Protein backbone atom coordinates (compact mmCIF):
# COMPACT_ATOMS: atom_id res chain seq x y z
CA UNK A 1 0.00 0.00 0.00
CA UNK A 2 1.40 3.40 -1.03
CA UNK A 3 2.40 5.72 1.77
CA UNK A 4 0.34 8.86 2.24
CA UNK A 5 2.13 12.00 1.10
CA UNK A 6 3.01 14.58 3.73
CA UNK A 7 0.46 17.39 3.84
CA UNK A 8 2.54 19.72 5.99
CA UNK A 9 5.01 22.11 4.41
CA UNK A 10 8.47 22.15 6.00
CA UNK A 11 10.99 25.00 6.02
CA UNK A 12 13.72 23.86 5.59
CA UNK A 13 12.61 20.79 3.68
CA UNK A 14 15.59 18.44 3.93
CA UNK A 15 18.31 19.71 6.30
CA UNK A 16 18.54 21.24 9.75
CA UNK A 17 21.70 23.33 9.86
CA UNK A 18 23.46 24.08 13.14
CA UNK A 19 26.14 26.77 13.02
CA UNK A 20 28.99 26.50 15.54
CA UNK A 21 30.95 26.99 17.67
CA UNK A 22 29.29 24.21 19.64
CA UNK A 23 30.52 25.18 23.10
CA UNK A 24 27.04 26.48 23.89
CA UNK A 25 23.46 25.59 22.92
CA UNK A 26 22.88 26.11 19.19
CA UNK A 27 19.30 26.64 18.04
CA UNK A 28 17.75 26.29 14.60
CA UNK A 29 14.10 26.70 13.64
CA UNK A 30 11.79 24.44 11.70
CA UNK A 31 8.59 25.98 10.33
CA UNK A 32 5.62 23.66 9.86
CA UNK A 33 2.72 24.92 7.75
CA UNK A 34 -0.72 23.42 7.28
CA UNK A 35 -2.10 24.45 3.87
CA UNK A 36 -5.14 22.17 4.17
CA UNK A 37 -8.66 22.92 5.40
CA UNK A 38 -8.38 20.41 8.25
CA UNK A 39 -6.48 20.44 11.55
CA UNK A 40 -3.32 18.34 11.53
CA UNK A 41 -1.59 16.63 14.45
CA UNK A 42 2.20 16.57 14.37
CA UNK A 43 5.06 15.01 16.30
CA UNK A 44 8.82 15.64 15.95
CA UNK A 45 11.18 12.72 16.58
CA UNK A 46 14.98 12.38 16.46
CA UNK A 47 17.52 9.57 16.38
CA UNK A 48 19.54 11.34 19.12
CA UNK A 49 17.04 12.45 21.79
CA UNK A 50 19.77 13.11 24.39
CA UNK A 51 21.53 15.60 22.12
CA UNK A 52 18.55 17.78 21.25
CA UNK A 53 15.75 19.65 22.93
CA UNK A 54 12.66 20.30 20.77
CA UNK A 55 9.97 22.86 21.66
CA UNK A 56 7.19 22.12 20.93
CA UNK A 57 7.78 18.50 20.02
CA UNK A 58 4.11 17.78 19.31
CA UNK A 59 0.77 19.50 18.92
CA UNK A 60 -2.03 20.43 16.54
CA UNK A 61 -1.75 22.90 13.66
CA UNK A 62 -5.02 24.54 12.72
CA UNK A 63 -6.16 24.65 9.11
CA UNK A 64 -4.24 27.28 7.15
CA UNK A 65 -1.94 28.02 10.10
CA UNK A 66 1.74 27.39 10.78
CA UNK A 67 4.01 26.87 13.76
CA UNK A 68 7.71 27.38 14.49
CA UNK A 69 9.55 24.52 16.17
CA UNK A 70 12.82 25.32 17.96
CA UNK A 71 15.44 22.59 17.76
CA UNK A 72 18.23 23.11 20.31
CA UNK A 73 21.51 21.24 19.96
CA UNK A 74 23.24 20.69 23.30
CA UNK A 75 26.97 21.63 23.68
CA UNK A 76 29.49 18.98 22.61
CA UNK A 77 33.08 18.51 21.40
CA UNK A 78 32.89 19.00 17.65
CA UNK A 79 35.06 16.84 15.38
CA UNK A 80 35.15 18.20 11.79
CA UNK A 81 36.16 14.76 10.49
CA UNK A 82 33.08 13.13 11.94
CA UNK A 83 29.96 13.31 9.80
CA UNK A 84 26.66 13.80 11.57
CA UNK A 85 24.33 10.83 11.42
CA UNK A 86 21.58 12.54 13.38
CA UNK A 87 18.18 12.70 11.74
CA UNK A 88 14.77 14.15 12.49
CA UNK A 89 11.35 12.96 11.43
CA UNK A 90 8.18 15.02 11.35
CA UNK A 91 5.21 12.70 11.68
CA UNK A 92 1.68 13.93 11.07
CA UNK A 93 -1.93 12.91 10.54
CA UNK A 94 -5.28 14.59 10.21
CA UNK A 95 -6.73 15.35 13.62
CA UNK A 96 -9.71 13.22 14.68
CA UNK A 97 -12.83 14.71 16.20
CA UNK A 98 -11.74 13.97 19.77
CA UNK A 99 -8.23 15.25 20.57
CA UNK A 100 -8.54 15.41 24.37
CA UNK A 101 -6.07 12.53 24.81
CA UNK A 102 -3.31 12.96 22.24
CA UNK A 103 -1.32 10.03 23.59
CA UNK A 104 -4.22 7.72 22.85
CA UNK A 105 -4.73 9.35 19.44
CA UNK A 106 -1.18 8.53 18.36
CA UNK A 107 -1.33 5.07 19.89
CA UNK A 108 -4.53 4.16 18.04
CA UNK A 109 -3.51 5.75 14.73
CA UNK A 110 -3.47 3.42 11.73
CA UNK A 111 -0.21 3.16 9.74
CA UNK A 112 -1.98 4.19 6.54
CA UNK A 113 -3.09 7.44 8.19
CA UNK A 114 0.42 8.51 9.18
CA UNK A 115 2.54 10.88 7.10
CA UNK A 116 6.20 11.62 7.70
CA UNK A 117 9.11 13.70 6.43
CA UNK A 118 12.77 13.18 7.28
CA UNK A 119 15.50 15.76 7.73
CA UNK A 120 19.20 15.25 8.32
CA UNK A 121 21.37 17.38 10.60
CA UNK A 122 24.28 19.40 9.26
CA UNK A 123 26.95 20.99 11.49
CA UNK A 124 28.75 24.09 10.21
CA UNK A 125 31.65 26.04 11.65
CA UNK A 126 32.03 29.82 11.14
CA UNK A 127 33.63 30.74 7.81
CA UNK A 128 37.31 31.70 7.75
CA UNK A 129 36.49 35.32 6.86
CA UNK A 130 34.47 35.57 10.06
CA UNK A 131 37.52 34.87 12.25
CA UNK A 132 39.23 38.30 11.77
CA UNK A 133 35.96 39.87 12.86
CA UNK A 134 36.06 37.81 16.05
CA UNK A 135 39.68 38.87 16.59
CA UNK A 136 38.71 42.53 16.25
CA UNK A 137 35.94 42.07 18.80
CA UNK A 138 38.42 40.46 21.20
CA UNK A 139 40.82 43.40 20.70
CA UNK A 140 38.06 45.90 21.47
CA UNK A 141 37.13 43.98 24.62
CA UNK A 142 40.79 43.81 25.73
CA UNK A 143 41.30 47.55 25.08
CA UNK A 144 38.17 48.44 27.00
CA UNK A 145 39.26 46.26 29.91
CA UNK A 146 42.71 47.92 29.96
CA UNK A 147 41.20 51.41 29.98
CA UNK A 148 38.91 50.41 32.79
CA UNK A 149 41.78 49.05 34.89
CA UNK A 150 44.07 52.12 34.42
CA UNK A 151 42.22 54.48 36.81
CA UNK A 152 42.17 51.74 39.43
CA UNK A 153 45.96 51.32 39.26
CA UNK A 154 46.53 55.08 39.37
CA UNK A 155 44.22 55.41 42.35
CA UNK A 156 46.08 52.62 44.16
CA UNK A 157 49.46 54.27 43.48
CA UNK A 158 48.15 57.62 44.66
CA UNK A 159 46.90 56.05 47.86
CA UNK A 160 50.29 54.39 48.46
CA UNK A 161 52.10 57.73 48.19
CA UNK A 162 49.70 59.62 50.43
CA UNK A 163 51.70 62.03 52.61
CA UNK A 164 49.62 61.33 55.69
CA UNK A 165 50.32 57.60 55.49
CA UNK A 166 54.06 58.18 55.04
CA UNK A 167 54.09 60.49 58.05
CA UNK A 168 52.33 57.85 60.16
CA UNK A 169 54.85 55.20 59.14
CA UNK A 170 57.78 57.48 59.96
CA UNK A 171 56.33 58.26 63.39
CA UNK A 172 55.82 54.55 64.04
CA UNK A 173 59.42 53.92 62.98
CA UNK A 174 60.71 56.52 65.44
CA UNK A 175 58.60 55.03 68.20
CA UNK A 176 60.01 51.58 67.50
CA UNK A 177 63.55 52.95 67.55
CA UNK A 178 62.91 54.39 71.00
CA UNK A 179 61.39 51.08 72.15
CA UNK A 180 64.40 49.13 70.87
CA UNK A 181 66.79 51.51 72.65
CA UNK A 182 64.81 51.19 75.87
CA UNK A 183 64.90 47.40 75.67
CA UNK A 184 68.64 47.45 75.06
CA UNK A 185 69.13 49.47 78.22
CA UNK A 186 66.85 47.12 80.16
CA UNK A 187 68.72 44.15 78.75
CA UNK A 188 72.00 45.66 79.84
CA UNK A 189 70.59 46.29 83.31
CA UNK A 190 69.27 42.72 83.55
CA UNK A 191 72.64 41.35 82.54
CA UNK A 192 74.33 43.32 85.29
CA UNK A 193 71.77 42.08 87.82
CA UNK A 194 72.09 38.53 86.48
CA UNK A 195 75.84 38.68 86.93
CA UNK A 196 75.35 39.66 90.53
CA UNK A 197 72.80 36.86 91.05
CA UNK A 198 75.10 34.35 89.39
CA UNK A 199 77.86 35.19 91.81
CA UNK A 200 75.46 34.77 94.72
CA UNK A 201 74.24 31.50 93.21
CA UNK A 202 77.73 30.08 92.96
CA UNK A 203 78.24 30.91 96.58
CA UNK A 204 74.97 29.30 97.67
CA UNK A 205 75.29 26.34 95.20
CA UNK A 206 71.54 26.49 94.47
CA UNK A 207 70.64 24.99 91.05
CA UNK A 208 67.11 26.47 91.15
CA UNK A 209 68.43 30.00 91.61
CA UNK A 210 70.89 29.52 88.76
CA UNK A 211 68.06 28.85 86.31
CA UNK A 212 65.90 31.86 87.24
CA UNK A 213 67.94 34.64 85.54
CA UNK A 214 68.19 32.65 82.32
CA UNK A 215 64.39 32.61 81.93
CA UNK A 216 64.15 36.40 82.32
CA UNK A 217 66.95 36.94 79.85
CA UNK A 218 65.31 34.66 77.28
CA UNK A 219 61.98 36.48 77.65
CA UNK A 220 63.65 39.83 77.14
CA UNK A 221 65.64 38.57 74.16
CA UNK A 222 62.44 37.30 72.53
CA UNK A 223 60.77 40.69 72.88
CA UNK A 224 63.83 42.40 71.51
CA UNK A 225 63.98 40.04 68.53
CA UNK A 226 60.28 40.57 67.77
CA UNK A 227 60.71 44.34 67.76
CA UNK A 228 63.77 44.11 65.54
CA UNK A 229 61.82 42.00 63.02
CA UNK A 230 58.90 44.45 63.12
CA UNK A 231 61.27 47.34 62.64
CA UNK A 232 62.78 45.57 59.62
CA UNK A 233 59.32 45.07 58.05
CA UNK A 234 58.46 48.74 58.54
CA UNK A 235 61.76 49.66 56.90
CA UNK A 236 60.95 47.50 53.88
CA UNK A 237 57.52 49.16 53.54
CA UNK A 238 59.10 52.62 53.65
CA UNK A 239 61.62 51.56 51.02
CA UNK A 240 58.85 50.40 48.65
CA UNK A 241 56.90 53.64 49.12
CA UNK A 242 59.99 55.69 48.41
CA UNK A 243 60.47 53.82 45.11
From Swiss-Prot:
It holds the Pfam family Motile_Sperm. Its main location: endoplasmic reticulum. GO terms for molecular function: beta-tubulin binding; cadherin binding; enzyme binding; FFAT motif binding; microtubule binding; protein heterodimerization activity; protein homodimerization activity; protein-membrane adaptor activity. The record marks 43 as: Involved in binding the phosphorylated serine of the phospho-FFAT motif. It is a single-pass type IV membrane protein. InterPro entries: Ig-like_fold, MSP_dom, PapD-like_sf, VAP. One of its GO terms (biological process) is endoplasmic reticulum-plasma membrane tethering. The modification Phosphothreonine is found at residue 150. It is found in: Endoplasmic reticulum membrane. Residues 2-222 are cytoplasmic. It comes from the Eukaryota. GO terms for cellular component: cytoplasm; endoplasmic reticulum; endoplasmic reticulum membrane; glutamatergic synapse; Golgi apparatus; plasma membrane; postsynapse; presynapse. The chain crosses the membrane at residues 223-243. Keywords: Acetylation, Amyotrophic lateral sclerosis, Coiled coil, Disease variant, Endoplasmic reticulum, Host-virus interaction, Isopeptide bond, Membrane, Neurodegeneration, Phosphoprotein, Transmembrane, Transmembrane helix, Ubl conjugation, Unfolded protein response. Ubiquitous. Isoform 1 predominates. The modification Phosphoserine is found at residues 146, 156, 158-160, 206. Residues 159-196 form a coiled coil. The MSP domain binds the FFAT motif of many proteins. Belongs to the VAMP-associated protein (VAP) (TC 9.B.17) family. Homodimer, and heterodimer with VAPA. Interacts with VAMP1 and VAMP2. Interacts (via MSP domain) with ZFYVE27. Interacts with RMDN3. Interacts with KIF5A in a ZFYVE27-dependent manner. Interacts (via MSP domain) with STARD3 (via phospho-FFAT motif). Interacts with STARD3NL (via FFAT motif). Interacts with CERT1. Interacts with PLEKHA3 and SACM1L to form a ternary complex. Interacts with VPS13A (via FFAT motif). PANTHER family: VESICLE-ASSOCIATED MEMBRANE PROTEIN-ASSOCIATED PROTEIN, VESICLE-ASSOCIATED MEMBRANE PROTEIN-ASSOCIATED PROTEIN B_C. This is Vesicle-associated membrane protein-associated protein B/C.
Amino acid sequence: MAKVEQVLSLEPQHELKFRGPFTDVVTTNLKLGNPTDRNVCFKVKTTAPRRYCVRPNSGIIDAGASINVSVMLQPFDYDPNEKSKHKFMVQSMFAPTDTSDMEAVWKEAKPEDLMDSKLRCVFELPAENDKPHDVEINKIISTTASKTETPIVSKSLSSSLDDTEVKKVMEECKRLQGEVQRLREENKQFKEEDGLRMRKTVQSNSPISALAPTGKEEGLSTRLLALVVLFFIVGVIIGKIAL
